[in-house]
Amino acid sequence: MAESTLRLSVPREGLSAGDVILRFPSLDDVDAMLPAFTDPELREAGNLPAFSREELVASLRELPSLAEAGRLLALAAVHAPADEVVGGGTLHHLDAERKIVEIGYFVLPHARGRGVATTIARMLAEHAFSLGIERVAAYVNVGNTASERVVARAGFTREGVVRSMPKPDGRRVDKTLYSLLPGE
């Protein structure tokens, strides 16, 4: 079978929907994004790794090469009028042969309750479809009702529980699998 040329990419100016822009994070975003990687509650809900400030800087510096390879898109979510970082989103675990990708998202506490997470999830999925993806998956920790509501509002369908999935810290938890197909 021929190797797929499907790659994850995003326009330099990012993606936008309403007043939310998804763009590549810069080193200027470190202080705004750091709580997502240091706050235990945010990390647990978002399946985010623990990063010190220095580790986050190093990670942000590495993102361009990962994006260039076409296998990971990690984007900052910005409230457009103020250029204020409100969260982030990823397209990751690309299976180019089967045209499947996973999404991830987080919203900082000050931006919650405004539909930002749903907007991020929908933007990422629509962008993935524009690249030729045929299935977008979202894994949500069992019991994370806020995130379950996000993916449901974004149009995802609940498929069931996947047992003993790894988290960035090595623990294993059960997750609910949701998916979205083009046209849904």
PLM regions and their residue ranges:
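A general structural signal marking secondary-structure boundaries and capping sites
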Residues: P40-E41, A67
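Short loop/turn motifs at secondary-structure junctions and domain boundaries
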Residues: S65-G70, F156
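Conserved GNAT-fold acetyl-CoA-binding loop/helix
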Residues: E41-E62, L73-L75
